[in-house]
Amino acid sequence: SPGPDRLERWHAKWASKQTRWHLQQEHPLLVRYRADLFGPQPRHDSPSAKATRSNVLFPLCGASVDLAALALRGYRVVGVEGVEAAVDALLETFGDEVEQAPPSVSGSLRLRTAVAPGEAGSDAPAVLRAVEGDFLHLSPSAADALGLPRFDAAFDRGALVAVLPEDREAYVATLAGLMAPEGRVLLVTVEHDGFAGPPYEVREADVRELFSPAFAVRPLQREDRMGAEPHWRERGCTRFEEAAYLLTRHRAG
């Protein structure tokens, strides 16, 4: 489906401030599985810390607080978001946006950057970058044109489950094209009945079918969320589970 149609409902949700999916603190699964996603990390104040920090991708990021949390720890964070109001909120909350001269654009995609004071004891500012535009347009060549790296890590919470089912294969192909060999993705999905979506149900069989050609798939956990999030019952659910997977990009060839 074309980009404007894909993004129209999300523009409407932001315009009416229907953003209940945002958490006010770092996502618990990102905290729990940080070592699985990034591998062992040096102390933040060690000389090698900055050099070994990962390039981290957040597809369909909205204004999630997770991006700022990692950027402030020295990770090189890039979010991708199709709703301008969401990118505005993300960067304004983080720090001061830096005007790009000339603007960094590739087709309908625009790279925006904000800076904030870095970690205590560090002279280097924290940097958060966001690509404003349709994630499915972020091909490897577009990423190169914007000066983006291939990513060592990515966090997908609320991205795949928000994508229309007919766009899932294109989403996975786009994500795979942006990941470095052996890059890791922490993927959070939901399984439920009662309504179609979003968030759409993505079962383990779906995850394996979608990702196995390009990634090794390792299930991490599954949790019943009906007790903690009773509003799903109001939407007709008799079950609502959250599942997490670690995906590791195959080596090229």
Outline where the language-model segments fall.
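Class I SAM-dependent methyltransferase "Motif I" SAM/SAH-binding loop
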Residues: 57-62, 159
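A short SAM/SAH-binding and catalytic strip from SAM-dependent methyltransferases
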Residues: 136, 151-167
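Generic beta-sheet signal
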Residues: 54-56, 152
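Class I (Rossmann-like) S-adenosyl-L-methionine-dependent methyltransferase catalytic domain
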Residues: 2-48, 54, 63-67, 73, ...
